[in-house]
Amino acid sequence: MKILVIRRDNIGDLVCTTPMLSALRQHFPQAWIGILVNAYNAEVLYGNPDLDEVFVYRKAKHRAAGSSKWRIWLETARLMLRLRRRGIDLAIVASPGGERYARMVGARRIIRDKPGQPAHEVERCCALLAPLGLPLAPGPLTPGPLTLRPQPRVVQRLQLAWAAFPGAPGPVLGVHVSSRKATQRWPAEAFAELIRRVLESGQIGRVLLFWSPGAAHHPLHPGDDEKAAAILAACAGLPVLPVVTGALAELVAGLSLADLVFCSDGGAMHIAAGLGKPIVCMFGDSPPAQWHPWGVPHVVLQTPARVVSAITVPEAQQAITQLLPLAGRAGSQP
């Protein structure tokens, strides 16, 4: 049996699909299982033990400078032809808009995404397996954990850079300061004050600072270089290590070196959950019931205003204090 899963949206969405991939492999151990993803999110599948093959296409909006839309479309058409020649028995469409790809590859059977179901994204993905006789959600069985593996060579490179970085004994806090949605953004001043508080109080030994790289006004990939620089300047003299993540593999590896993580709802939050980290997560107008960190200790911060900027620094510090007893020491050894 040849099964193709189609997941063509964002990083966190793909991470939330990994328990469904594990369930497929568990119940169909001899099947060939492939997945079609986009170039933006593909690296989170590095080393995934449940997949035989990963097929990557590039969205036109993510094309490199000098690359035309026609070239992107031609490459995608060639990929669809390759998959069609595989003779796909079953396509599982795990995200909206993916059904046309299932038709293009000529899948003999298609299980479609059903948007609008009131469940966590992990449970919604696993519910797609119900037609195959796998009552994972809703049902008596709970979906398993997320699956995410950092690339060892990237982890080692970051550890070497970290070895010469001063810091006090104690847990390592990963802080990710970026979010695509305006309602999910916390001010640079608030991040800086929180970092100063947890370091000066001795609660935290070191801080790893993460952000989306690039200029704020970049037309395709707006980033937070200026915001990160402002936070670092406000925390000068403190053990705050900037972690530049030009590739998704670097974000995964960097977060793997933290003991607990503070961030807004988004891809970094789901990556941290996939790495087993306790998480304090700030939610704006997204529903935590659908998107909270899966399978790890976490504290959700959300105000009645449904904007992250309304969350106070003392509230954030209290949540970190609450999770500290559950923090490991993943990052404490270089």
Regions found by a protein language model. Give the residues of each.
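Catalytic machinery of carbohydrate-active enzymes
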Residues: 1-334
